């Protein structure tokens, strides 16, 4: 894996994305290729549902890669989704660096949006995990703030879409994939489930208005040297009890397999 190869593959797949989804399409993939190559001890990829565009993005393809890496340059984080992705990814990377899990309370300074109860890691040289990971959307076209799960699943069932997604995974070559888009079949396919060890972890999240039992599934494929975690979408945490248990569960799972990478 080298820079020239990653740039060429990303550019090639960008053209496939533009052909498959017309108009306002999100060109996603690796956040920052130089950073991705610099820190390849554990390569992390998040699978989300679909992008939500600002008015300036309508009508033409745009770089989703810039969108999520720019979140680290803003004052605080621009969205709950990217903030939570950053914190969990940072925790997984620290497992590899330190050889042990960083507890939620020992993370770098956490700040809050004004009027927002969701925690967000403040930006510093140490805490720029969005530069070091990849983020992919199941559907590359603009969606609503609340996705239609049936539409997302139907998108995955299109052969052309699945081909593009797996071409992206092939060149990104992640070791830890977090499927956070309600498409369980994607997690099974990525893990090549018949060749994988399979486990689950259940937790009851207690939100302000309801309790919800969330089952996190995870697969480890020794042949691919790949951990696939099927988890809740990070932006949903305000409904079911907050970030700490989500962070703890996902990072604990990753830490159990980190010695393989």
Question: Would you name each region that the model predicts?
Answer:
Residues 1-99, 119-121, 164, 168, ...:
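Active-site and ligand/interface coordination hotspots across diverse enzymes
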Residues 40-44, 127-133, 219-229:
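Beta-strand-turn-beta hairpins that frame and shape the catalytic cleft
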Residues 83-86, 91, 126-139, 143:
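Short, contiguous, well-structured surface segments enriched in hydrophobic/aromatic residues
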Residues 165-183:
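Proline-aspartate-enriched helix->loop->beta-strand connector
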Residues 49-54, 139-143, 182-186, 233-237:
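Short, solvent-exposed loop/turn segments at secondary-structure junctions
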Residues 93-129, 196-223:
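Short mixed-charge
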């Amino acid at each position: 894996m080298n820079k020239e190869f990653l740039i060429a593959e990303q550019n090639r797949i960008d053209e496939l994305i533009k052909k498959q989804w017309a108009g306002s399409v999100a060109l996603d993939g690796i956040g920052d290729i130089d950073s991705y190559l610099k820190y390849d001890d554990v390569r992390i990829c998040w699978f989300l549902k679909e992008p939500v565009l600002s008015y300036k993005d309508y009508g033409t393809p745009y770089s989703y890669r810039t969108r999520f890496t720019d979140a680290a340059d803003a004052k605080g984080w621009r969205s709950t989704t990217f903030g939570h992705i950053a914190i969990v990814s940072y925790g997984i990377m620290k497992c590899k660096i330190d050889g042990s899990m960083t507890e939620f309370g020992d993370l770098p300074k956490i700040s809050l949006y004004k009027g927002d109860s969701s925690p967000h890691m403040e930006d510093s040289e140490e805490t720029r995990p969005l530069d070091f990971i990849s983020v992919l959307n199941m559907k590359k076209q603009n969606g609503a703030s609340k996705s239609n799960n049936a539409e997302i699943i139907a998108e995955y069932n299109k052969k052309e879409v699945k081909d593009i997604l797996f071409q992206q995974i092939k060149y990104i070559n992640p070791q830890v994939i977090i499927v956070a888009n309600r498409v369980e079949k994607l997690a099974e396919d990525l893990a090549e489930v018949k060749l994988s060890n399979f486990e689950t972890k259940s937790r009851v999240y207690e939100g302000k208005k309801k309790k919800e039992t969330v089952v996190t599934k995870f697969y480890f494929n020794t042949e691919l040297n790949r951990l696939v975690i099927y988890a809740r979408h990070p932006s949903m945490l305000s409904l079911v009890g907050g970030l700490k248990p989500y962070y703890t569960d996902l990072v604990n799972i990753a830490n159990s397999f980190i010695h393989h990478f």
